[in-house]
Structure formats: structure tokens, C-alpha cells
């Protein structure tokens, strides 16, 4: 167990090297000063400052306190009196009471810092100083007040055994607020900080180089801050005999850790190396940039110290341990990230603008990481909307059509993880003489569910210079930031506002504009659009399985505001009644139908409803055959040998192949040589030359939705099909002309086409295998006698080596 101990008044060193000053525990405040702080002073209201602009000359800072300790959060304001100062805690107004006192200069005194107990709230939190005068309101940066704490050790030092001349390292870790100061004791006595062999690092590390026998002992880690003092468990150091005669490769025992610091802090990159002979430790940056010399120091035998770090010090640092006189080296690396709090490169400037014009503030801040910029108007967060625009990552604030309601103090607040900063500016709206008054008699009348007609009368005075009107529109339930505008001609005194939402209340007001500025706004008027039943919702279908499907649509959350939702119906097309309605809320976007008949076509209806009734339905016809049937398309020419009795014999297979090839040749020759039409073909071949009538499930395995895209009852072709045309085939096969060659003898159109040996080439067309052929001198025994016209010269038939006949082509199965 860690042993609690009363804090000693001695100084506690952090870095034991020349050039490093040991930090001190904060001394108690002088009694006289403490007495003055505790004296209550009257609340400030007058004469805080005489600068024209309201601004903070002192802002509160973060602080850490012990319970019972008095705390003062500083705040000083300059500006045109009278100035009222108040405080906020965690965003809420902090009431005055006996526990806190507002001092004359605007600072806040907390008499006795307390934690939450017995129903009393804790004083921990974020505090803001608020200043206000007749020009506006200003809020300071946030100051965080925390209680001092000290945890138990979560890493205690461990026993170490080393050789004479070697290196020993102890480490302890503990958390606390403020960060604990770590010191070390040997055998209950503070270690000798004058011994250069002892190196103390502020993160709780003790390094001992050049070990000697007298270094043996028990070491303790001592952590202290304003909250407490704690002592770790003891760890024994045992130093054995010298091993200087044994060669050892250089080894890095501990390399640098990844560090994240804030600018102006001190970075300690540790590197402990051993070996025999003792290795030489050096440092470099991974990106090749020089480390530099200003603020750089090596502590002990290889620890790199960077004082007053900047963002430029960020990078990866490499520790190298080299064996003297050789290139043998070991390396370790760690990343240093330096963060910088937000600070302003460009402050917003106070401006004056005529009424009705545009005011613009620019605020640019830098920091690491890049800060986020927020705008405040009189202490309240200002968002984009209406006539307020934020551009360039919130660095530019634009206010169009400024009016008296826009006069305020605007603050730019830049904040990142390292800190925050604020700057302010004031907007003054100028009113020119002779501006028209506000438009009069503004009325709004509902015309339909999406339209409202707004009418008005021109102002009483100064109407000759009016160049137009601007109508401001927003939902009555929305913030003024969400309003939008529509411009109207100067000769028009009514305007039809379109594209509104049904059954919704809207607010309207209007301004008159002249070259010198805008008038005051008219009195706002309200009107509600008429109600109507919802429009049909878009509906799509997705297949889930052979007997289930999913219906999809877009949710309409607005339906819930008008006592509405969706109604779903479905039925087989052969049924007389629907299943349903299935009532669904407006936030639902899908519904699954299951246990359906795969062989049945279903009719599905979806409609939206509200307090005005049911809207029109969206209807879909859905078939599940695409999921239940995965069969190939029927071949276009399905000529079969009717008298084949043994389908499994080799002879039957060969005969079937020849018959199939012959029928395909007949089909192609008939299509290629149109003059040979009126060929007597078997009825099966003629039927198969027609476009297929069944659903093309093989091309589209999804749902077949029968919504005017599929084939009708009359046998018309679907959208993606077309009949086979002889002219189209001539374009596809230009070498196979339809006219007879010179010298050929015309054949009897009633005579059957000869069946000849061919060499085939397959071309895919509309789901059919079309065959283009070349005739040879030999005739097929299946055709009658008759001359065959020679085809166009398309060259000799190529034969492979050792081949005497054209290769056989497998018939489609």
C-alpha cells in the first residue's frame, strides 16, 4: 500500500541538470492579500472603463483548488458605462449568494471551494464572465474550475539487477490534478541530486548510469501536489560484479514514447541504451529536418530535452545507439505532437451599415489542430438561416437586409482541444432620412393546400422612392433563422406564395426598399394552408425468395403530424378481395410479404392517408416465377425425331444431332435466301421461329413486374424484343446476299430447300442462335435434286493441320 505522508516544505527537483530550475509548490497567499480578497465589495455597474467598445481586459483562467480554499476568477471589462457584469456557470446564470461575491472590478470570489455533498452543488464547472451595456452583451472565454486530486500509484517501481558500469532504470506512474511532482528516495533518504550519474525525468523515471556497488539499496517514488503526498512501494537495486570483459551488442532498453504537448511546454524524449563497449546515443528526425540547437539539451546519457516547444517541433524523432567505431546500430522512434490553442490572425471589426443593406464580419483564427469557429450574437449562439449566412468554414458572417433587430455585439469564438479565444465587434444600423414606413394592412389568405395569397397596402409616407418589396416567409413553428424571401415589384400589392406544405401555419411580413435602405418590417400575419389527402407514394419491389418479397418506399414523417400513415393491400389477381388494410406509421419505409404462391401473380396497393382522407394508391403487379423457375430459354428450332425410341443409345444420339443440325440449316437458309421462301417446313420449326412467349427468366432472375413492360394478352412483343427480319439479317451477314448470283437458275418456290453440308458460325440475336452457312458441292441425302445457287465469294474454308473436312459443330442440346 502507498503510504500517505505530510508534505515536506523542501524544494522538489524535477530535472537534475544545470540549466533546469526545480519547480516549487505554490506558496500560500499572504495573509493581508487573502483578507482583501475576502472583503465584499459592491457590485459593479458604472465606470468600469471608458472605451467606446465593450471588451475584456482581463478574462478568467482555468484553476485547480482544494476543498475549503477561496478562489478568485478574474474579470475586468472596458466599455461605455453603465456596464453590468454577471457570471454563468455551465451556461446558466449564476445567482449571487453568501457562497459567492461579485467584486468591484467584475471578478468572482468563491469563499470556500466545495465539492458536491449533502445536497450542496459542487463548484466544479465552466465559468464565463458576462458584460452588458446599451450596445449589447459580451461573453468571456470559458474558465474550467476543478478540484485537486491524487490517485493511487497504478505503476510501482520494480526490482532491478545490474552489473557494475551498467544502467538501472526505475519508473512509477500516478495521476493527479495538478500533475504530481515526482521525486525519489534511496533507503528513505532523498537521492543525491549532485551525483551526475542520477537522472530524474518529470514523467516519473529514475535512471542510474555507471552502476557501482554502493548504488545497491531500496528505492521509493514520492508523488506530491496540493492535494496530497504519496509514496510508492519499495524496489531493490542489486549491483553484481563487473562484466566489462564481455562483448555485448548495443541494445535500446527504453525508447521514446509518443507525446502530445501544448506549446511552451517541455518535451522529454527518453532513450536508454546498453552494450559493451558503451554505445553512443544520437538523435535525428525521421523527415530529415535538423533538430536545431536552441532550447535543445541532452540529459543523462541520451535523453533529449526540448524546452518551450512549438508546432514546428512536431514530428517523429529517432534515437540511434551506435557501437563505437562501427556501423552497428539500433534505433527506436517516437512521435511528438505539439498542439497550439486557437489565436486570431484577423479580428472582426465594428461596422455601421444602412438599413436594408448587407453587413459582413470576417474572423480568421489559427491553431493546431485547426480551431472551430462559432459566432455569438449578444452572447447567444448564432446559426445560419434566413438572412444570416456563414461562409468559408464559418470565418465570414454575412447579414443581409439588416434592420434594428440586427444591432448587437457579435463575437467570434475560436476553439480547439488546446484552448479557446474570442473577439468581438459591434454592428450599428443607420437609418436614412425619408425612408418609407412599414407596409400596411398585410393580410394572408389560403388559396389551396400549397398556396397562400399575401396582400398589403403601400406605406403612408415617402412612397415615391420605393423600388420594390421583399416578402419574408417562414413556418410559424420554425426559428426566424429558417425564413426565406421573395422579391415583389413596386407596383404589385399582392403575391401568391407557392410550393408550401399542406396543413401548415406560415408567418409573413414585408419590407419596402428604396435606394437608401429598407423600411421597418410590417406587422407579421399568420395563415395556414388547406389540407389535402397525400399523393401516391413511390413503391418498388425486391425479391427475397421463392415465396416472399419486400416492398420499399420512402418514409414520410410528416404524416404522423397529421394523424396519418400508410395502408397496404395485396391479393392474387384471381381473387376478388384484398388482404388488408395493413396500417403502417409514416416513419416506416418497407414491409415484407411471405408465404406467397410462387405460381401466382399478385396485385399490391400502397396509399398514404391523413386526417383529410386516403390518397390515391400506387399499384404493382408482381410475379414470383422469376425466383421459382431457373430454366433455360427454349431453343428456337426444336426439331425432334418423333420415332426415336432409344434415347440412351449412341445411334439415337448421333441421329438426333444430325437431325437438329439439318433443321437449323434449313432455318438459316430460309432466312438468308428470301427468294427461296415458301419452303415447306415442319410445323414445329415454324412455331419455334416465332418470338418466345414465355417470361425471359433466364435474362432477368429478379421479379417480373407486370406494369405495362411485359407482353400483353394479344401477343405483342415486349419492349426489349423485336421480330426477326430478313433485311436485318442481310445487314448482319453482308456476305450472304439474298439475290441469286448471275448464271444461277431460279428454283421453284414450292420446292423444298436442299439440305447441304455447311461450316457454321453462331451469332446471338434476341435470344436465338442464328446460323450462317456456306454451301459445298456435295448435297445432303435429306434434300431432293435441284441446282444450288453459289453463294457470294467469301473465301476458302480454313482447315487446321491434318484436317480434310470442316470441323463438326455440336448441336444445341
UniProtKB/Swiss-Prot annotation:
On tissue specificity, the annotation reads: Detected in cerebellum, kidney, heart, lung, skeletal muscle and spleen.
Where is it mostly found?
A: membrane
> Could you list the residue ranges that cross the membrane?
653-673
Q: Which residues are glycosylated?
A: 105, 258, 393-394, 592, 616, 646
According to the record, the signal peptide region is 1-47
Which keywords label this protein?
Disulfide bond, Glycoprotein, Immunoglobulin domain, Membrane, Repeat, Signal, Transmembrane, Transmembrane helix
Give the span(s) annotated as Disordered.
1-21, 689-724, 775-813
What intrachain disulfides are recorded?
A: 75-129, 172-221, 271-319, 363-412
Location in or out of the cell = Membrane
* Fibronectin type-III domain mapped to chain residues: 438-532, 535-630
Which domain of life does this protein belong to? Eukaryota
Coiled coil residues, start to end: none
User: Which InterPro entries did the record assign?
Assistant: FN3_dom, FN3_sf, Ig-like_dom, Ig-like_dom_sf, Ig-like_fold, Ig_I-set, Ig_sub, Ig_sub2
Does the keyword Cytoplasm feature in the UniProt annotation? no
> Record's Gene Ontology CC terms?
membrane
Q: Which Gene3D superfamilies match?
A: Immunoglobulins (2.60.40.10)
The family database entries (PANTHER family) matched by this protein are listed as: IMMUNOGLOBULIN SUPERFAMILY DCC SUBCLASS MEMBER 3, PROTEIN SIDEKICK
Similarity-based family: Belongs to the immunoglobulin superfamily. DCC family.
What this protein is called in its record is: Immunoglobulin superfamily DCC subclass member 3
The beginning of the lineage is: Eukaryota, Metazoa, Chordata, Craniata, Vertebrata
